[in-house]
Amino acid sequence: MQKVVLATGNPGKVRELAQLLADFGLDIVAQTELGVDSAEETGLTFIENAILKARHAAQVTGLPAIADDSGLSVDILGGAPGIYSARYAGENATDQQNLEKLLDTMKDIPDDQRQAQFNCVLVYIRHAEDPTPLVFHGRWPGFIAHKSAGNGGFGYDPIFYIPELGCTAAELTGEQKNAVSHRGQALKMMLDTLRNA
């Protein structure tokens, strides 16, 4: 089994990606288990930040790395919270604080203007100097609900409503979510590419 470092300290992302990669023959190790500090996210896009994180983890560990940069983009807010999704309510904000700030920001926004999408950029980098990192983008459209529903997932999942499923992302099982989510889409693209490489 090939060891690959997962360049995140977010336990929700580690859990989702490890579950999705279990059958692929990759031994996924979270960077925190290897004593790797988080890279500074100085990019202006999900792609830039994912590459920064993957390159940093590969450089420190000497292992191939997978990095994820993802977030929620709300149309009426010009794409916010976007790359700042994890710290929308402040630098050390909890998921609940971020979610509550978004609900408060959108309290007067009518239903027909609550479109949003989760975006996930996954980067696979073979080594720290890799000049051609593999980049995959998944997008999951939905709407921002008026209140939380469900106990699954993490982050904004309890207020991310998927009309065709009639529920929020937090009301899906992990398996259901992985089949349709932005992260599941990006990972499927990555695995298809690695399989055929």
From Swiss-Prot:
The keyword Metal-binding applies. Binds 1 Mg(2+) ion per subunit. It comes from Photorhabdus laumondii subsp. laumondii (strain DSM 15139 / CIP 105565 / TT01). Substrate binds at T8, G9, N10, P11, G12, K13, S70, F154, G155, Y156, D157, K177, H182, R183. Its cofactor is Mg(2+). GO terms for cellular component: cytosol. The lineage of its organism: Bacteria, Pseudomonadati, Pseudomonadota, Gammaproteobacteria, Enterobacterales. This is dITP/XTP pyrophosphatase. Gene3D superfamilies: 3.90.950.10. It is an enzyme of class 3 (hydrolase). Homodimer. It catalyses: XTP + H2O = XMP + diphosphate + H(+); dITP + H2O = dIMP + diphosphate + H(+); ITP + H2O = IMP + diphosphate + H(+). InterPro entries: dITP/XTP_pyrophosphatase, ITPase-like_fam, RdgB/HAM1. Mg(2+) binds at E40, D69. Pfam families: Ham1p_like. CDD domains: HAM1 (cd00515). Keywords: Hydrolase, Magnesium, Metal-binding, Nucleotide metabolism, Nucleotide-binding. One of its GO terms (biological process) is purine nucleoside triphosphate catabolic process. Its EC number is 3.6.1.66. One of its GO terms (molecular function) is XTP diphosphatase activity. Belongs to the HAM1 NTPase family. Pyrophosphatase that catalyzes the hydrolysis of nucleoside triphosphates to their monophosphate derivatives, with a high preference for the non-canonical purine nucleotides XTP (xanthosine triphosphate), dITP (deoxyinosine triphosphate) and ITP. Seems to function as a house-cleaning enzyme that removes non-canonical purine nucleotides from the nucleotide pool, thus preventing their incorporation into DNA/RNA and avoiding chromosomal lesions. The active site is at D69. PANTHER family: INOSINE TRIPHOSPHATE PYROPHOSPHATASE, INOSINE TRIPHOSPHATE PYROPHOSPHATASE/HAM1 PROTEIN.
